[in-house]
Design a protein with these regions (language model features):
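Transmembrane alpha-helical segments that form the membrane-embedded catalytic/substrate-channel core
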Residues: 21-30, 52-61, 84-102, 152-167
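Flexible extramembrane linkers and terminal tails adjacent to transmembrane helices
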Residues: 37, 71-74, 78, 103-112
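Membrane-helix and juxtamembrane interface regions of eukaryotic multi-pass membrane proteins
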Residues: 1-50, 78-80, 84, 149
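Single conserved hydrophobic/aromatic residue that forms the stacking wall/gate
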Residues: 172-181
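Membrane-interface transmembrane-helix boundary segments in multi-pass integral membrane proteins
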Residues: 119-126, 141-154
């Protein structure tokens, strides 16, 4: 990708963005053994529509309108944001792969996770992704990044609540009484 106003800071942003989406699009789906591979057509259409709108906002807000000098790498926003982004991505990926490993070692069906952050919260994968995009909003210090963070929370937090309620209502016993949403 070449655009005359882009500099190395923009390319670092692009690498982080692509790292998330390459993993989410081309690696993770092939690691998951889906029991029911059918889904309503509205789900991929909604996902593609969201991503088209979001990429447009991010591209305009960060890559076309955002002005970042080389000194941005020393800015506390960048340092804190990249730390959160990488930490959130790690939490997200590790949580997902922990669930995958449970299915591979214990067979099909649901198995209660009780390791890593699953000891404390019901959906650390969602938590990690929210932290990741909070980091994005901070490291880009942009309204576009903030919009994406709010969209992520609006999507994932209700799902985390529903997942936690499912834990409580299902036959699965939560052995950690301090586990939170």
């Amino acid at each position: 990708i070449y655009y005359k106003n882009l500099n190395v800071v923009h390319y670092v942003f692009l690498i982080l963005w692509l790292a998330h989406y390459i993993h989410r699009t081309f690696i993770y789906p092939f690691m998951v053994d889906m029991e029911n591979q059918k889904m309503p057509i509205s789900i991929p259409i909604s996902a593609m529509s969201f991503n088209f709108i979001n990429v447009s906002i991010q591209f305009y807000g960060i890559f076309l309108s955002g002005e970042y000098s080389y000194q941005w790498f020393m800015n506390p926003y960048f340092c804190i944001g990249i730390g959160l982004f990488i930490s959130g991505m790690y939490i997200n990926i590790r949580s997902d792969y922990y669930m995958i490993s449970l299915r591979k070692t214990r067979g099909p069906g649901y198995h209660q996770p009780n390791s890593f952050l699953y000891k404390y919260i019901s959906s650390p994968n969602y938590f990690g992704e929210m932290i990741e995009w909070l980091g994005w909003a901070i490291l880009t210090a942009s309204s576009a990044g903030l919009i994406f963070f709010f969209w992520t929370v609006a999507n994932l937090f209700p799902r985390a609540i529903a997942h936690h309620k499912w834990y409580k209502l299902s036959l699965i016993h939560i052995s950690e009484p301090t586990r939170r949403i």
